């Protein structure tokens, strides 16, 4: 029996109160903040909201002169920068369908995705275009540089002429600036998933899906006009787009784009210089800081001694918290962690030291937000409660104690998968609930805790549900482990481990000694696990696991 009566109403099915359209959020932000800095590339001069408005209108003019019709598809692929951001605002507010593609897609994947999308125009970074064969794109009328809006290649003279005129001035002022009305149910973008199961799908997101996310962000995140933001996650991914750009833009913030994901040194420099009012990261960033810097520092000498004395450990906690806050600029309201599960050891430590963090939950199919709680009401190991206009249900006879699949309804839920009715039908149940593919439990007051992915679950010999992610999180905390994957082989659990060769070499450990170290840790780890979750064998991997552009492991390659 599916539990639904109580939990389906947590969050809200709020359809009584009207919501601004996505384009209205953009227009309002530009008019309210006309003279304030809006966007800048790292260490470059900022562009004001008024300049963004003028740039949007120039792109609108070019699209019209190209003969691009509303609802036609327009691709953008390249590194994060001001032009990428403004192009997204321009194409969606013009009425075309944006197709943002991650810059890390291979050229064959890029070809397949662009052709599958039925796009007619491509905005692309020069360095990507250099490796593209234009003959592979029969429907594309032109390729436009995301670096400077010049035509890279075109089969249509109208495209050449339209973008030759791009730099011509256009009469735009705060009083005259206006964008057309586009209804919530119109298609805004097709966002292609990066495919941990080997198949990329085009998620059809509406203007209402984006408006729901922006409305949520502007209501719960206490940023104001002029506050600063660092954007480091890919804008072509729903998480980075919604919460490092669209929300902050709608609030009048000044957003700085770092381009590609920077080295740790550049990232810390940027946070120190910009001092953002909010930090949005994936768990990997926090986990790397913890494993490389914090854990070694508190595991020896005076810090280790102080942590062993109950009355003194707060001294260490306070010092570590201050250093971690300073690493992110020292001026943030909170650090939002999302995009993947946060390691429990790391989260427990952040919780103990009183670090201002929260873990949210979402997926591309929800553009992306599903649950969230501000840091001061967040609960350890939970990812918050349903946002406004969203309902969450657990497919379980006892949702508070027995995990089941997380089901979602709301105004942020996608239309379906582009040209894939079979996948769309399989993703929604008979009552119209989106099947997330994640399992979890929920409390009486709506806090969601995730267990793992349905498709990754391994059925134990006695029928137990084994979530490999839980075991991998423990393994990844061990010394000399870069990453791990737990798989079933012959009814036994095997741990595939990528060793930290650099650290092992530094400590004088060859492959044989690393294996001895891992086998010793395996025995200790198995003592902490239920018998049915015990690891029977460790296999060392010479190379890191193959990943999607979003940096998720392609698990299907190792099963």
List each language-model region with its residue ranges.
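Conserved ATP-dependent adenylate/AMP-binding module captured primarily in the ANL superfamily
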Residues: 103-137, 213-230, 263-277
């Amino acid at each position: 029996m599916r539990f639904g009566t109580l939990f389906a109403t947590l969050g809200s099915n709020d359809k009584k109160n009207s919501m601004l359209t996505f384009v209205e959020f953009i227009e309002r932000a530009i008019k309210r903040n006309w003279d304030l800095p809006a966007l800048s590339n790292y260490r470059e001069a900022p562009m004001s909201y008024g300049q963004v408005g003028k740039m949007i209108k120039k792109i609108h003019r070019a699209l019209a002169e190209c003969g691009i019709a509303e609802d036609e598809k327009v691709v953008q692929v390249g590194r994060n920068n001001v032009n990428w951001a403004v192009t997204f605002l321009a194409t969606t507010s013009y009425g075309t369908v944006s197709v943002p593609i991650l810059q890390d897609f291979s050229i064959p994947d890029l070809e397949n995705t662009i052709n599958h999308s039925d796009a007619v125009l491509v905005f692309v970074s020069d360095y990507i275009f250099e490796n593209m064969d234009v003959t592979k794109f029969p429907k594309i009328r032109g390729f436009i540089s995301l670096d400077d809006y010049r035509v890279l290649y075109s089969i249509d003279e109208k495209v050449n002429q339209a973008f030759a005129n791009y730099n011509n001035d256009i009469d735009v002022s705060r009083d005259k600036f206006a964008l057309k009305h586009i209804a919530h149910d119109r298609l805004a973008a097709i966002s292609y998933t990066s495919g941990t199961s080997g198949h990329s799908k085009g998620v059809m997101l509406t203007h209402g899906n984006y408006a729901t996310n922006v409305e949520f962000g502007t209501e719960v995140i206490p940023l104001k006009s002029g506050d600063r933001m660092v954007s480091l996650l890919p804008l072509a991914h729903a998480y980075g787009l919604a919460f490092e750009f669209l929300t902050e833009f709608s609030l009048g913030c000044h957003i700085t784009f770092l381009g590609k994901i920077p080295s740790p040194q550049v990232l810390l420099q940027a946070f120190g210089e910009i001092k953002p009012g909010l930090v949005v990261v994936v768990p990997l960033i926090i986990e790397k800081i913890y494993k490389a810097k914090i854990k070694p520092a508190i595991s020896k000498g005076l810090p280790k001694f102080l942590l062993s004395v109950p009355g003194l450990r707060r001294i260490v906690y306070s010092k570590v918290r201050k250093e971690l806050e300073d690493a992110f600029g020292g001026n943030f309201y909170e650090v939002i962690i999302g995009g993947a599960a946060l390691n429990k050891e790391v989260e427990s430590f952040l919780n103990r030291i009183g670090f201002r963090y929260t873990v949210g939950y979402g997926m591309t199919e929800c553009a992306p937000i599903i649950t969230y709680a501000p840091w001061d009401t967040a609960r350890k190991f939970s990812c918050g409660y349903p946002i406004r206009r969203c309902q969450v249900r657990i497919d379980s006879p006892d949702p508070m104690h027995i995990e089941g699949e997380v089901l979602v309804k709301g105004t942020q839920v996608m239309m379906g998968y582009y040209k894939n009715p079979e996948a769309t039908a399989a993703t929604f149940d008979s009552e119209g609930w989106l099947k997330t593919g994640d399992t979890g439990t929920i409390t009486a007051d709506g806090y969601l805790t995730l267990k793992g992915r349905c498709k990754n679950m391994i059925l134990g010999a006695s029928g137990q549900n084994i979530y490999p992610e839980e075991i991998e999180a423990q393994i990844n905390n061990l010394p000399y482990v870069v990453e791990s994957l737990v798989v079933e082989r012959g009814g036994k659990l095997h741990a595939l481990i990528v060793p930290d060769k650099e650290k092992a070499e530094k400590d004088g450990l060859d492959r044989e000694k690393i294996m001895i170290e891992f086998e010793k840790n395996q025995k200790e780890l198995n003592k902490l696990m239920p018998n049915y979750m015990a690891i029977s064998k460790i296999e060392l991997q010479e190379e890191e696991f193959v990943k999607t552009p979003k940096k998720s492991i392609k698990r299907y390659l190792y099963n």
